[in-house]
Amino acid sequence: MTLVFNKSTEALSSLVNVLLQLPGKSSYTEPCTALSNATIGQHTRHIIELYQCLLAGYPAGEINYDDRKRDMLYENDITAAVNLIKEIQLDLDRPDKPVKIMCQTEDNLVFIGSNYYREVLYNLEHCIHHQALIKVALLSIKDIEIADSFGVAPSTLQYRQQCAQ
């Protein structure tokens, strides 16, 4: 399952690369009308927090993605967000094991069986989805180099490569 960890690390690295190119705090925290007034910082925080939920729930084998801290620090401070992303990258590679995903419905707490590797894959797909949204905001900022693969699923990249041959 090294591939899943490598792809997750690559996706997080590409996010860090883009964040470090931002010309200032305002480009990280300024609402983007194309994103329903969400910010790059809000999307970054959301990516971070799902990975945090996964890592925090790993020891007990119970992961609750709804129980996010919603820490404004990572929404407003690029340096703090980048540093935490780097910590997540270092901590992600763990042995596979069964886990339960906790989900609160209107009336009940539901547990869904999964495993750690599957949840790393889920977080990768979630990260890429939010990168695609972040890319919309980035396109309005000058002098930022955005990789063609940023915000694009690996399967889509493979398909595009096959079509180009």
State what each model feature region is.
Residues 14-17, 21, 87-90, 136:
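A generic structural signal for well-ordered alpha-helical segments enriched in polar/charged residues
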Residues 20-26, 106-111:
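Short amphipathic alpha-helical segments and their helix-coil junctions
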Residues 2, 49-91, 97-109, 142-165:
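Short, helix-capping/interhelical loops that line the mouth of catalytic, cofactor-
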Residues 25-32, 100-102:
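Glycine- and aromatic-rich loop/turn segments at beta-sheet edges
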